[in-house]
Amino acid sequence: MEHANPILLGNNSPQKFITIGEVMLRLTPPNYEKIRMASSFEASYGGSEANIALALANLGVDSTFFSVVPNNSLGKSAIRWLRCNDVHCTPMILSSKEETPSCRLGTYYLETGYGIRPSKVIYDRMHSALT
């Protein structure tokens, strides 16, 4: 994929990056609610390495993300999210229950800070497809 404004090396060749990590389902209560008070959550995807791949792709860098996700609708939706944001996902592995018995997508809960109250994150990634 060619981009209009690629980031170039010293020899004017375009940069290519691959990030390796875990894409995770992010659940956030709406309107700065605290998790303990929430009756609903907004779902999106994240994870440090996935976010870096997406940010680089948005800057016009040829970006590839490698991870293992469960072979179910959550894993496939995470891959679709990355691809819709111009991140290459060819090396992604869709894991079966035989390969990773729990076959889970890591999840984290983000309580968005408000005013002087800081944001809080709770991770639930034990036995996820990548770990």
For each feature predicted by the language model, list its residue ranges.
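Glycine-rich, flexible loop/turn motifs
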Residues: N31-Y32, M37-F41, F65, H88, ...
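Alpha-helix C-terminal capping segments
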Residues: N51-D62, C84
